[in-house]
Amino acid sequence: MGEKKEETATKPQGEKKPTDGGITTVVMKLDMHCEGCGKKIKRIFKHFKGVEDVKIDYKSNKLTVIGNVDPVEVRDKVADKIKRPVELVSTVAPPKKETPPSSGGAEKKPSPAAEEKPAEKKPAAVEKPGEKKEEKKKEEGEKKASPPPPPKESTVVLKTKLHCEGCEHKIKRIVNKIKGVNSVAIDSAKDLVIVKGIIDVKQLTPYLNEKLKRTVEVVPAKKDDGAPVAAAAAAPAGGEKKDKVAGEKKEIKDVGEKKVDGGGEKKKEVAVGGGGGGGGGGGDGGAMDVKKSEYNGYGYPPQPMYYYPEGQVYGQQHYMMQGQSSQSYVQEPYSNQGYVQESYMNQGYGQGYGQEAPPPPYMNQQGYADPYGHMRAPELFSDENPNGCSVM
């Protein structure tokens, strides 16, 4: 008998046998601009094993490959060549059934004892419903963790030199470009720049120093907005002062005279108001004690000019005839000054009165003015003359 030789044909591992499943239609979608793209794709499948036909639909940008091929391999090949994304439209072929490698001997069969013993099932762990609810709550709490609150808008006051309106426009333009800035206000009188928004002060100052080429300082904010609080506190304080002053005025109205020991002089309390006397009493006034002997009054009024009637003046007699004009020149001593006042009198024709003259002052028998008549007015609103007034 002849010996039978078993011939085993070995093939290289790189080669793949075409699937024995028959012809497969692979539809792919990709971008094709023109017929040149279609010709290039057809050249790709010219030497591809298993491909029988290639169809291209330019309107819908679809490529159809017919043959005994692997759809995934065809898609990767096209995408690699044209350098564009390729989408596989048709369903992928089912995977191949892998045959176990032949070991040369009879296949081992499982022992009948192993087949008879069914697989032992482990008891499932019993879970309590309360534990599940707690776990779900924890997971939901972690997911629904409140996000961090957004940063609050703040106001930053910067101090820098402002020379002119050009500087102000430049600073506004630079600051408005910073992210988070809402508004910019400039106080040129105090050289202040007020910036409102969500700002990082540590990064803002060096940035402005570099851009403006000048020093920019941050004015520290007062604690708890001290300015408004101070203003609010000042308002009631002012009201309290006004109430106190009003009460003092009411008390001062009941004026009482007191006798001073030894001198016998009388002292009277006078309320002297300040500020708003004629304007409706708006200002605050204070009360003070005024003595008649201590009140100096106002300055001396200007010395008036006097017209003297015809007759003797300083012992000199001037005779006038009717129808003749006369003039007399009189020197009067100014009280308490040490110099002499000169007055020029003009008398008209007839009786000597060419012009209406004011009433003559008090004259004594010698015909000259009383020097005591030129002294300063008595004390303002004194006891002797409560309605008197001095001419300023």
From Swiss-Prot:
Protein name: Heavy metal-associated isoprenylated plant protein 6
Protein keywords: Cadmium, Cell membrane, Lipoprotein, Membrane, Metal-binding, Methylation, Prenylation, Repeat
Effect on the protein of changing C164G: Loss of metal binding
Classification via InterPro entries: HIPP01/3/5/6, HMA_dom, HMA_dom_sf
Domain HMA: 23-86, 153-216
Record field: compositional bias (Gly residues): 272-285
Residues reported to bind Cd(2+) 1: C34, C37
Effect the entry attributes to changing C34G: Loss of metal binding
Documented effect of changing C167G: Loss of metal binding
Molecular functions per Gene Ontology: metal ion binding
Cellular component annotations (GO), alphabetically ordered: plasma membrane
Expression across tissues: Expressed in petioles, hypocotyls, peduncles, vascular bundles and root meristems.
Residue ranges listed under propeptide: 390-392
Organism for this UniProt entry: Arabidopsis thaliana (Mouse-ear cress)
Record annotation: effect of changing C389G: Loss of plasma membrane localization
Basic and acidic residues bias locations: 1-19, 106-145, 258-270
CDD domains registered for this protein in UniProt: HMA
Gene3D superfamilies (alphabetical): 3.30.70.100
Lineage: Eukaryota, Viridiplantae, Streptophyta, Embryophyta, Tracheophyta
Modified residues annotated as Cysteine methyl ester in this record: C389
Disordered: region residues: 1-22, 89-157, 258-285, 350-392
Covalently lipidated residues, kind S-farnesyl cysteine: C389
Gene induction: Up-regulated by cadmium, Hg, Fe and Cu, but not by Mn or Co.
